[in-house]
């Protein structure tokens, strides 16, 4: 059974006339009237402000009707004709223009017929990515920057939608795993549900260690996560095949959690981690007083990280190094680098995730026919 929504505004009599015409043609239809208050601009408001007020009043009314379950929505007032395309762009529910191409208002009978025969198939929804941000703040900005740079767009409008649920107060993931500190599960879950409620299509997390908790919340979230470790390991396999000898530089929490190690083992790729001395230097590069989380990207933190990289290459013959904490790419760049006299590829999981997100978004846009 079709449900038609009508925005009443200041035109109650017209709305009732249209409703009566609809029911006279098809009594099985449900007609919802939105009689929410319309904000009135000040008497001395500019024409631009008055028109913006009309747009926003109608936008809010359409949103209420869509939430109430309307399949198609019409207007008792003819003014939405002036900004009809702009209004329709913001919704997947079908709207019906109250006027003909010339701008003349349709009669109640003609408009009722237009509403009754309107296609109720929702318009395709633009792809939207949700990011749980604040893990940490600089890594969040870094991932977003890499997504923007990886997107082959020539105009602002060719980029896809992305929402960041920024919550730097999410408890420290490494402390939880290593010291029994506050658990971030509920904070991350709350962020994920907010992104789901905001109509996102997928969720990304700009923190390697946080992925240890993603598996705990994933079953309770209705949209998929794009897993940073998975896409990183897939890129390594595609690039190096069975020639890859991988070294992992990450937080001790990530190392012990097996986020990368388990995937490497399942894919048949050897992976090594630093010894205790060099793992301590990796942690210092991240958490130390002159580390990345303190805002440093050169000097002592670079020396610490380079020392761990050299250990992995010299001791285990690694030819691929994973920057397995999202702060580490702030210190070392992705790409080929000579370490201990050997050419080694440094892969940034943040960049790998950005590339995959762009690919998924482009494929969705092509399938849906809308950005």
Whereabouts are the PLM-identified features?
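Non-catalytic structural scaffold of enzyme domains
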Residues: 1-371
């Amino acid at each position: 059974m079709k449900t038609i929504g009508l925005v009443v505004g200041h035109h109650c009599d017209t709305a009732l006339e249209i409703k009566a015409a609809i029911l006279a043609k098809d009594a099985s239809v449900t007609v919802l009237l939105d009689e929410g208050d319309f904000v009135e601009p000040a008497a001395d408001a500019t024409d631009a402000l008055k028109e913006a007020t009309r747009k926003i009043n109608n936008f809010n009314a359409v949103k209420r009707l869509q939430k109430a379950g309307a399949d198609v929505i019409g207007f008792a007032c003819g003014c939405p004709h002036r900004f009809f395309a702009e209004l329709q762009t913001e919704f997947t529910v079908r709207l019906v223009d109250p006027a003909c191409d010339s701008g003349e208002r349709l009669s109640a009978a003609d408009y009722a017929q237009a509403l009754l025969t309107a296609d109720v198939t929702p318009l395709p929804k633009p792809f939207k990515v949700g990011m749980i941000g604040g893990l940490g703040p600089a890594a969040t900005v870094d991932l977003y920057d890499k997504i923007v740079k990886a997107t082959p767009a020539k105009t602002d409008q060719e980029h896809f939608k992305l929402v960041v649920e920024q919550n730097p107060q999410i408890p420290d993931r490494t402390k939880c795993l290593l010291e029994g500190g506050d658990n971030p599960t509920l904070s991350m879950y709350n962020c994920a549900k907010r992104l789901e409620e905001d109509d996102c299509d997928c969720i990304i997390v700009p923190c390697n260690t946080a992925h240890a908790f993603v598996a705990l919340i994933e079953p309770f979230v209705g949209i998929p996560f794009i897993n940073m470790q998975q896409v990183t390991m897939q890129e390594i396999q595609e690039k190096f095949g069975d020639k890859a000898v991988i070294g992992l530089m990450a937080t001790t929490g990530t190392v012990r959690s097996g986020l990368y190690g388990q995937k490497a083992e399942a894919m048949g790729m050897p992976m090594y981690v630093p010894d205790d001395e060099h793992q301590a230097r990796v942690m210092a590069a991240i958490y130390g007083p002159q580390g990345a989380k303190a805002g440093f990207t050169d000097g002592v933190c670079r020396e610490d990280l380079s020392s761990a990289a050299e250990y992995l290459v010299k001791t285990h013959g690694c030819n691929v190094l994973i920057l397995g904490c999202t702060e580490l790419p702030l210190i070392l760049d992705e790409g080929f680098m000579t370490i201990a006299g050997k050419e080694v590829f440094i892969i940034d999981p943040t960049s790998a995730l950005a590339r995959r997100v762009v690919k998924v978004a482009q494929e969705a846009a092509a399938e849906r026919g809308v950005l």
